[in-house]
């Protein structure tokens, strides 16, 4: 996907002439302070119209989005049942839960409100990954997790996305999350523009 845009929030230009190309299957981290424009950038990728320029996401791509501060209704069904409803395959549902670190058989029967904050964060990921997205957008990834948990979740998510060929764009201001994700591209968002830093060589 690729774009070149200008976007405003309440008459203040958040992004000016921003240009970025993201190869399919890449892991990209948007870094920057709160209010720098990371959420605006994700919303543009999600389909919000820019004030100028264009955002080009290949047609037919499945896009999944985890918002930042807003709580998402995770339902009342046991977590294994909830993932199974999306995949229609018990084995595949168990595999997805295992990959995000929810591998305890007791947890399979737990309902979302019975989970810890970190477990709910991982369950949200499991639900979206069960939709088999081509592009996964996450705002303020792992914002409410302690450092060790944030690292574990980031490591697991990065590995899962690489294995499944999912393009990931995650916004964060936490350096330990950036290090754990080990992205292909680090994009600093601020001062109305973007600064890109490649971090990985070609994949083998």
Regions found by a protein language model. Give the residues of each.
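Conserved hydrophobic segment flanking the Walker A/P-loop of ABC-type ATPase nucleotide-binding domains
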Residues: 21-22
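Helical segment within the ABC ATPase nucleotide-binding domain
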Residues: 150-163
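Conserved H-loop
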Residues: 165-171, 174-181
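ABC-family P-loop ATPase nucleotide-binding domains
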Residues: 3-9, 66-123, 127, 131, ...
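Walker B catalytic motif
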Residues: 137-141, 145-148
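Conserved structural motif at the start of ABC-family nucleotide-binding domains
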Residues: 14-17
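ABC ATPase nucleotide-binding domain signature region
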Residues: 27-95, 190
């Amino acid at each position: 996907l690729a774009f070149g845009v200008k976007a405003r929030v309440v008459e203040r230009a958040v992004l000016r002439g921003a240009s970025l190309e993201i190869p399919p299957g890449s892991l990209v981290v948007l870094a920057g302070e709160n209010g720098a424009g990371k959420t605006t950038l994700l919303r543009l990728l999600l389909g919000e119209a820019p004030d100028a320029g264009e955002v080009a996401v290949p047609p037919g791509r499945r896009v999944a989005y985890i918002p930042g501060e807003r709580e998402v209704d995770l339902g009342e069904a046991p977590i294994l049942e909830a993932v199974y409803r999306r995949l229609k395959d018990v084995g595949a549902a168990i595999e997805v839960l295992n990959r995000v670190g929810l591998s305890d058989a007791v947890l399979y029967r737990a309902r979302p409100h019975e989970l810890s904050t970190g477990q709910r964060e991982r369950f949200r990921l499991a639900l979206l990954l069960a939709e088999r997205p081509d592009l996964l957008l996450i705002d303020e990834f792992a914002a409410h997790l302690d450092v060790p948990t944030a690292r574990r979740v980031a490591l697991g998510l990065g590995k899962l996305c690489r294995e499944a060929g999912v393009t990931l764009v995650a916004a964060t201001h936490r350096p330990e999350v950036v290090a754990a994700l080990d992205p292909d591209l680090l994009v600093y968002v601020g001062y109305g523009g973007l600064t890109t830093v490649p971090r990985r060589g070609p994949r083998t």
